[in-house]
Structures are given as structure tokens and as C-alpha cells.
Amino acid sequence: MPVPDSVRLAMPVEAVDIARLQRKAWSRQPGTAAALAAIPADQAVRTWHEAIVKPPLAHCRVLVALSQGQVAGFVVTGPSNDPDAEATDGMVAEFVTDADVLDDHASRLVNAAADTLRADGYETATWWVRSDDDALRGFLIECGWAADGAHRSLGTEDGTEAVKQVRLMTRIADRGPAPNAG
């Protein structure tokens, strides 16, 4: 019987698939070669396993998108660690989909991330996006996210590789019931 496509919390055994997808995504992105080379595949699997079974904070979650029963993407949510963050700000810390299924599973993952952050009590969600990732930024804008003016540059200590990012945000708080018009 076919398994319906869905998004759910990651299972420990899926750490291998998550690490594989992350490494595949990082290998396609300029500026991440040093990070990819510095982390052996088995260490990445152990790190993801730990994040699933013993997250660093109670509100840190790893969600997976399933396609025909296989992991096709993942998203990590948690409290925002930005210096200007409020206690009610959550964030999408990592978002990866298999390049072949972006359209199919990206919206499921984005919606599940927002739902998870909302359920954890956050009112606003933030997301750092590579400044040159027009496809992801455009997709998120279509989903209701907007740039908030913040930007940063991440890179290696020797300065040989740098990734410029812009921050997007969206309001996720429940707006409550509509006022009674009668």
C-alpha cells in the first residue's frame, strides 16, 4: 500500500537520510565547500541523530518530508538566536529539500515549520536565506514571508569563503476568532 506524502517529526533512523540530503545540498552551494569538507559523513549522521533524540533545547525540532515513504526534505525549527530576537520569535534554522522535489514538498515543510513554531508558542518566525538564492527567497515571499532589512555574512575564519544572507520573517501567531459582526 502506498504511503501518502507527508511531514512529521524525524525518527532517529532517518539521521542517515537527513545527513545525505544536507551534504548533497551543501555540495551544490557555493561557499559551503569548506564546511562540507570539515564534517565527515559519519559525524554528520551522529550529529543529526543527537539533534533528533536529544535536542539542545526543548523547542528544537527536526521535521522530515516523506515522498513515497522516503525522506525527501527536512526542516529544523527552534527559538531565534538573533541578537535582536524577542522571546516570541522562532526560526527556521535549516531547510533542505531534494532538488528534484522542491515544489512538491517545500510548501508542506514551510507550513509544518510555521505550525510547529506556533504550537511552541512563537508569534513570529524568521529565516536566514542566502542572498543569491532567488528561487528560495521568491518561494518564501509567495508563502507570505518578507525581508525585514537584516543581513549578515557567514564565513570561514580565514575569510576564503563567505555566505551573505538576508533575513525573512512572517507573523505566525493565531489571530483568534473573527470579531462578531452581529
Task: Give the ranges of each region predicted by the language model.
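Conserved beta-strand-loop-alpha-helix junction that forms the acyl-donor binding cleft
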Residues: 97, 127-137
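Conserved N-terminal entry element of GNAT/NAT acetyltransferase domains
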Residues: 1-16, 20, 24, 33, ...
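Conserved catalytic-core motifs of GNAT/GCN5-like acyltransferases
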Residues: 128-129, 141-164
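Acetyl-CoA-dependent GNAT
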Residues: 9-12, 23-32, 36-101, 110-112, ...
